[in-house]
């Protein structure tokens, strides 16, 4: 689950990374649900990444998480083309952005 406890650790890890990549893929296949803190932190990461010119791609978002993110207006922030059904599609999307 992507909820309060893991959201803080995730945010800390993202801020400690060195070089800023052109694309960052976040694999969501093992995230059965997401709470409001998780949405807040994921949104903050996307906003920060936009400022740094890094594209965020989500991979493997299940229906429950998809519905929550959609209701929160998250897809307008990220762009539907950056929500991929699996890692292979996400990697192809990333490749198209860096070529």
Specify the residue positions occupied by each region the protein language model found.
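Structured cytosolic domains appended to multi-pass membrane proteins
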Residues: 1-99
